[in-house]
Amino acid sequence: MFLSSRTIFVGLCFLFVLAPCFTRATTNEVQVSCDSHNFNNGKHFRSCVDLPVLDSFLHYSYVRETGVLEVAYRHTNIESSSWIAWGINPTSKGMIGAQTLLAYRNSTSGFMRAYTSSINGYTPMLQEGPLSFRVTQLSAEYLNREMTIFATMVWPSNTTVVNHLWQDGPLKEGDRLGMHAMSGNHLKSMANLDLLSGQVMTTKAANDNMLLVKSIHGLVNAVCWGIFIPIGVMAARYMRTYKGLDPTWFYILIL
C-alpha cells in the first residue's frame, strides 16, 4: 500500500513538471502561420503578419527608400454576404481619420468591388472617396470563404511604423454596408505595425487588463488548490516516515 501511494506521489510531481512542456508542444502544432499561404494570382510578398483577431492576415512588401507599400489584406472564414476593410490611420490610433481599403462581393453579379474611403466619424457611410495618399492596383477576390484586398500605396519615404486597423461587417439589401459588431474582437482590431520587423503592437484597453488579471488570478488558484496543496499534503503524509528526509517534508508542506 505504501509503495502504491509513493508511486502516485512521484507521478503527480512528474506531471506537474512536464505539463507546461506538453501544453507548449500542442499549441505549436495547431498554430497556423501566414507564411504557408499561396495566392491564386501568383503574387508574392516579402513579409506577412498573423493579425491577432478576426481571422485576418496581412501580406506586404515595403521599400523604405521610396515609400511604396504593396499589401494584401486577407480575411478567412467569412461569408460572401460580408464586407471587409483594412486601413492606415496617419494621424492617430483610432478609427477617425483612417484611410481605408474596402471590398465586398456584388450580390447580383457576383463580382468583387474594391474601393477607398476616408473615415471622418464614428458612424461613417463608407462611401467611395480619395485617400490622403496615392493608391494604385486596387482589386479584391473571394474564394473558399476567404476575401482578400490587394493594393499598392505610396507613403512618405522612410516611414517605418504605422497605425493600422481591420474590420468586417454584414452586407445589407442593395449591397449597403451594414454596421460592424460593437463588441468582442471587433473592438480590438487595431494595432501599430512595424513595417521593417513585422511586429504588431496592440493597445490594451482597461477592460482587457482587468480580464487578464482575472485570468491570472484563476490560474493561480487552480495551480495552488489543484496541484501544490495536494502535493504538500501527500509529502507530509508519506515522506515523514523516512527519518532521512526530516525536515524536508515539512518545508515542502509549507511551500
Curated annotation (Swiss-Prot):
It comes from the Eukaryota. It holds the Pfam family DUF568. Keywords: Electron transport, Membrane, Signal, Transmembrane, Transmembrane helix, Transport. The chain crosses the membrane at residues 216-236. Residues 176-255 form the Cytochrome b561 domain. InterPro entries: AIR12_DOMON, Cyt_b561/ferric_Rdtase_TM, DOMON_domain, UCP037471. Residues 1-27 form the signal peptide. It is found in: Membrane. GO terms for cellular component: membrane. This is Cytochrome b561 and DOMON domain-containing protein At5g48750. It comes from Arabidopsis thaliana.
